[in-house]
């Protein structure tokens, strides 16, 4: 199973990457803080991930166990269409970025899962060079932007713009879904139609 969305970034704030992380931080049907971690620990999955590309964000899963496969589909579908990001701003702050003060004499710093992940990515000279090449070759396209987020620009992303990006791109008519394997595809499609 795979659900993906066209998510072209208009800047380098990393909004698509931050949403990829945050939709997996609980949803309407699965209100636990981090269902992704729970799935990794308790599922029979053979593949479970989420990835942000320059023009799309994808959520693939695989399992040889039919019951587990259905459960994984349910968790991922609810995560992308009914995430807790609208209820809890803290999810955005934790996974995206926030200001932090260790003590009253320390400088204010920026922290966040995606922010720190991308600081690591930007520490590689090869990656910096490749990003500059894409920016030079395709200046007026989505490839000129850093879909994962540039640490310099990530703090420019507001909570409101982040939610607007989810509303704009995370709906069924902007998604592509595929199923592969030994299963009753009509049954899965009926379930998706009924539930989402």
Describe the function of each predicted region:
Residues 1:
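Betabetaalpha-Me/HNH-type nuclease active-site subdomain
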Residues 4-14:
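Short pre-active-site segment immediately N-terminal to the catalytic Zn-binding motif
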Residues 8-9, 22-196:
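Charge-rich, well-structured scaffold segments of protease-associated domains
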Residues 14-15, 32:
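Short N-terminal amphipathic alpha-helix/helix-capping patch enriched in small hydrophobics
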Residues 15, 19-23:
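Active-site His/Glu-centered metal-binding helix of metallohydrolases
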């Amino acid at each position: 199973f795979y659900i993906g969305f066209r998510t072209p970034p208009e800047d380098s704030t990393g909004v698509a990457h931050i949403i990829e992380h945050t939709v997996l931080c609980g949803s309407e049907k699965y209100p636990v803080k981090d269902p992704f971690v729970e799935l990794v620990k308790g599922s029979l999955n053979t593949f479970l991930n989420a990835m942000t590309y320059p023009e799309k964000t994808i959520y693939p899963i695989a399992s040889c166990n039919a019951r587990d496969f259905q459960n994984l589909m349910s968790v991922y579908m609810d995560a992308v269409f009914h995430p807790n990001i609208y209820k809890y701003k803290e999810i955005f702050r934790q996974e995206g970025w926030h200001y932090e003060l260790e003590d009253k004499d320390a400088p204010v710093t920026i922290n966040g899962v995606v922010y720190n992940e991308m600081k690591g990515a930007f520490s590689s000279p090869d990656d910096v060079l490749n990003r500059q090449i894409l920016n030079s070759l395709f200046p007026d396209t989505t490839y000129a932007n850093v879909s994962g987020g540039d640490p310099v620009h990530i703090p420019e992303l507001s909570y409101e713009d982040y939610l607007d990006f989810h509303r704009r791109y995370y709906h069924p008519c902007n998604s592509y879904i595929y199923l592969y394997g030994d299963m009753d595809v009509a049954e899965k499609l009926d379930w998706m139609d009924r539930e989402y």
